[in-house]
Swiss-Prot record:
Organism superkingdom: Eukaryota
Record carries keyword Signal: yes
GO molecular function: acetylcholine receptor inhibitor activity; ion channel regulator activity; toxin activity
Subcellular localization(s) per the UniProt record: Secreted
Tissue expression: Expressed by the venom duct.
PTM comment: O-linked glycan consists of Hex4-HexNAc2 hexasaccharide.
Entry's family note: Belongs to the conotoxin A superfamily.
One term under GO cellular component: extracellular region
Modification 4-hydroxyproline, positions: P40, P55, P60, P61, P69, P70, P74
The protein, known as: Conotoxin MIVA
Length: 79
């Protein structure tokens, strides 16, 4: 297959997936709004796990007190 043919197939796939996903967004008609309002309470954040609520996580205690030393940027002089 030539380069032009592969590019045409790629564009057709992108167009097809876009056309298929647009009607499915409209079909929900706001029914997902209840799920999105409830989601933050159900998702456990890394900070909550890290600060002692979940004993199975391994993370430095300085993350809970925000006293971790700043990371050095690679490729720069770190004087």
């Amino acid at each position: 297959m030539g380069m032009r043919m592969m590019f045409t197939v790629f564009l057709l796939v992108v167009l097809a997936t876009t056309v298929v996903s647009i009607p499915s967004d409209r079909a929900s008609d706001g029914r997902n709004a209840v799920v999105h309002e409830r989601a933050p309470e159900l998702v456990v954040t890394a900070t909550t796990n890290c600060c002692g609520y979940n004993p199975m996580t391994i993370c430095p205690p300085c993350m809970c007190t925000y006293s971790c030393p700043p990371k050095r940027k690679p490729g720069r002089r770190n004087d």
